[in-house]
Amino acid sequence: MVNSAVAAAPAAPAAVPWGAVWGQDEAVATLQAAASDPDSMTHAWLVTGPPGSGRSTLAYAFAAALIAEEGDEQAMRQVLAGTHPDMTALRTEGVIISIKDARSLVERSYFSPSLGRYRVIVMEDADRMVERTSNVLLKALEEPPERTVWVLCAPSDADLLPTIRSRVRTLRLREPDIDDVARLIAQRTGADLSVAEQSARHAQRHIGMAQRLATDAAARARRDAMLRGVLAVRGVGDAVEVAGRVVAAATEDAKALTAERDEAERSSLLRTLGIAEGAAVPPAVRSQLSALEDDQKRRATRSLRDGIDRVLTDLQSMFRDVVMLQFGRGAPADGDLINRELEPELRAVASTWSVERSLVVLDQIAETRRNLEQNVAPTLALESMLVTVASGRIP
């Protein structure tokens, strides 16, 4: 049985929402042709693209086109709400996709569609599969039932095993232009175009993150303070202090993102079990509450790690700007700097550091990301990286 990691797809309008897949006309045309022409159909797809490029949105639009007959608004809404019996979506709340969840998807893939033309299995974050989990999918991807379609989503095809890549048709999404993202964000949120442009630039074209920055002045301020704090690191003491602040801020952000949902899930489960809020939980049902709490802990861990990963992405962009300045690029007119607002500080760093030191720092940021994937404590990983920022040497 698929556990709580299998979640509903995002809500969307009744018509096939191809228009919501912004700036990906070629990919949309490919999937529209596949949905309407059996000769263009492939039964296992991999949609790749940078974060925020619309991978999941495209996958759900494709599922809606495959399952719902034209004009069947009820079926369309069910698919996009994740309630259609022929639609299964896996959105993992953990750091990795479990073998249990993968096996559950494989079992469902062998059911014939009950109402629609196809049964569609969407796996978001397919890059979170470890090798053993990937192996569970191999036969289902190679020899799927005639009316089952798999759609995997990942940042890059390199994030999946060659044995998976060889069994899917890859569709690569392009990275949108910053100006186009800015116009979209301004249109969606009503934000001033200059704020939308800054947010799109800082988010490095990630539409969802750009939208958050454009609508949250506090988030913009935290990002700016974090970058300035890192530039001020001069020694081990500073590295320890700044790493602690960064992890604390990421932890608070993670709590804010998950706390309301956690409480709503707990209240819903208690109501389902017939237990009044605040009443003692009978021993017979404590295991169900414990299972929910375990799921929530995994989600909190992933949310924190995602927050730290965003910090590393921002730091990578800043020291990339330093390298650009060292190579004589980065004038505001040519649009090379991501963090233009820090240009004076970045020029000061570029003039005092060697290119080799800047590249060592960028390498250490990448190494920090790998360390976090190996479950190194975030504070320790960041401290080590910031010592490199201060000294120019890997500790």
Name each region found by the language model:
Residues Y110-S112, N135-L152, P162:
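Conserved catalytic/switch belt of AAA+ P-loop NTPases
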